[in-house]
From Swiss-Prot:
NCBIfam families: cysS (TIGR00435). It comes from Thermoanaerobacter pseudethanolicus (strain ATCC 33223 / 39E). Monomer. This is Cysteine--tRNA ligase. Its cofactor is Zn(2+).
Amino acid sequence: MKLYNTLSRTKEEFEPLNDKIVNMYVCGPTVYNYIHIGNARAFIVFDTVRRYLEYKGYKVNYVQNFTDIDDKIIKRAQEENVTTKEVAEKYIEEYFIDADNLGIKRATVHPKATEHIEDIIEFIKILIDKGYAYVVNGNVYFETAKFKDYGKLSHKNIEELQAGARIEINEEKKNPLDFVLWKAQKPGEPAWDSPWGKGRPGWHIECSVMSTKYLGKTLDIHAGGPDLVFPHHENEIAQSEAAYGQPFSKYWMHIGYLNINNEKMSKSKGNFFTVREITEKYNPEVLRLFMLMAHYRSPINFSLDLMEQAKSAYERLLNAVANLKHLLTVCKDRELNEEEKRIKEKFEEYKKEFEDAMDDDFNTADAISVLFEMSKTANTNISGNSSKKLVEYILDIFLKLSEILGLSYRGVETELNDEEILALIEERQKARKEKNWKLADEIRDRLREKGIILEDTPEGVRWKRV
């Protein structure tokens, strides 16, 4: 299996540090608003990477953080006259509603920056002790000139980075590229005690601390959006490798940009969509399919016309599943004849083609093409006279491969009636009260598989069919 490593700019054989365990960190959202479809592309892509690694037999420790203290969160809190904690908690909840809707699996850990202040302070102390950071007026900065490999991820030297960087002039910094590790408190802003005075962490340090705390000093995969290569990921490498003296991540994965109607997504231009806006109009799996129909490193263009095309494509797959499920109820359970054995072999070949596509840098576009070939072959070769054993085999293989892409075709059937749904919700509430989070999550996942989405609100649990 090969993946493209931003660090080397080449496709490399994937060999995790530990034979059957993959430690993967994905930069999560800054929680001050609903996630937009650009965010969603990254989360869908890396959820799919995780699913395929699990399909291949790896145990994936998947960590995705929440940045829950930030200038944008502070601004939103001031506008709404609430605390930053209230803003963050609201939009973390909204994130999970959208993520569950899109079939994005929960991370092994979803750490929040504000819950790791002590860890962050200890990390900064290491950098100061090693001579990589300096303190000015309660602010702590990382001294980029001290880190000789600065620029290795973006493949630029310090002079090129300085020339291309849009960096505010700051008299406190020794170098314009130096970045803040700890920000001194400003009036009216939340702050925590530190050896340098009251303040809060810088953005870059949060990810270094949370990733290494839960996954170790060297990760297998660190992933995120294209805009994070510089400065965020570059700075993460600098501070992590300066602190620990070993490679921060073996592989770096970045998605391509997402444009809207051939222009960069921008709120001011009005060409901006939240996930919520799109999933209110389309089945969430249509958006998921749309995101995966292009290679993850390719830029993609989003428009409602293209979503209509994705909807038609999704319906073709949905119809194939519905047809196979119907045939299960009418076909006789007999052994395969010679022609059916040949058809079964053809589907074994399809499975191999799908895996080959995914083994080649997670080429979901080619993998989806294989699903369409499978649906076409099934529609033309399987009928009510076919062996039930063959139908079961084809349906099983089709659903397993679709599941790697996060497609469960929830629209095909909802076997649960309202009474059964309410009974399961009650069982989940009981599990939550008893702090049996595993059972509560299993019930939520089971309901989601049946096309039922739960929404925890202050008034209680709401549910809807999708």
